[in-house]
């Protein structure tokens, strides 16, 4: 996964993304790499942003890409050092300014912002209505907590259709649709806030194969009374 895929990944909604690789943007940006229809992150932090493309197949720079979606980026940051701090302390509140502002005021704004565990981010990235992909003998339902395009493509490449449901779809609606399995997708934020999704998945247990990726695994674990804990 490259920077284009990461920046358009709905799982990073509500977060400032930082790259540990020292140079980003050298091969440009192409829409074929998008994992959603827009940049999902709130900001991008890099050591150096390449200004000259080294890819004949792209014409859009990383800077152009971020500006297109009005997402701030910052370079000349010691990302290796910052990574060590985040590794020790965990995710930290942060803010990026696009104009002159007092340092203390910017820090205060960041501190006033809600923690990511208290934000409802999944509704911002989930499909608002049912969408279908492919016409095959078997179909998998995906509860869309922030699915990436590549996940859908993997099913289609294996001759499996996809019925993409909003994250809060009632379990009976999924049963009535008649699918062969259920996947709970990745997504941003705190899975414990998805009480409705957890309740619906619990009612679908033992009806057909169920699996999840990232946040989806946490949702399924919650239906069995599991708790999440960082090791």
Regions found by a protein language model. Name each.
Residues 1-172, 176-177, 191:
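RNA-binding accessory domains that recognize and position tRNA/RNA substrates
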Residues 176-231:
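Cysteine-nucleophile active-site neighborhood
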């Amino acid at each position: 996964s490259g920077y284009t895929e990461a920046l358009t990944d709905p799982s990073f909604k509500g977060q400032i993304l930082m790259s540990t690789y020292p140079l980003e943007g050298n091969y440009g940006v192409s829409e074929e790499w998008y994992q959603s229809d827009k940049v999902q992150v709130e900001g991008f932090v890099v050591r150096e942003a390449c200004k000259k493309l080294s890819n004949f197949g792209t014409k859009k720079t990383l800077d152009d890409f971020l500006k297109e979606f009005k997402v701030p980026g910052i370079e000349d940051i010691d990302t290796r050092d910052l990574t060590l701090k985040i590794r020790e302390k965990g995710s930290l509140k942060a803010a990026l300014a696009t104009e002159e502002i007092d340092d203390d005021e910017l820090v205060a704004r960041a501190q006033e912002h809600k923690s990511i565990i208290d934000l409802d981010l999944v509704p911002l990235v989930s499909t608002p209505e049912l969408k279908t992909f492919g016409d095959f003998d078997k179909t998998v339902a995906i509860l869309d907590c922030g699915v990436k395009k590549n996940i859908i493509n993997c099913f289609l490449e294996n001759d499996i259709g996809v019925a993409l449901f909003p994250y809060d779809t009632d379990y009976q609606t999924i049963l009535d649709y008649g699918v062969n399995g259920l996947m709970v997708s990745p997504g941003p934020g705190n899975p414990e806030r998805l009480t409705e999704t957890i309740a619906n998945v619990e009612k679908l247990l033992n009806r057909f194969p169920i699996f999840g990726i990232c946040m989806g695994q946490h949702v399924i674990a919650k239906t069995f009374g599991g708790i999440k804990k960082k090791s």
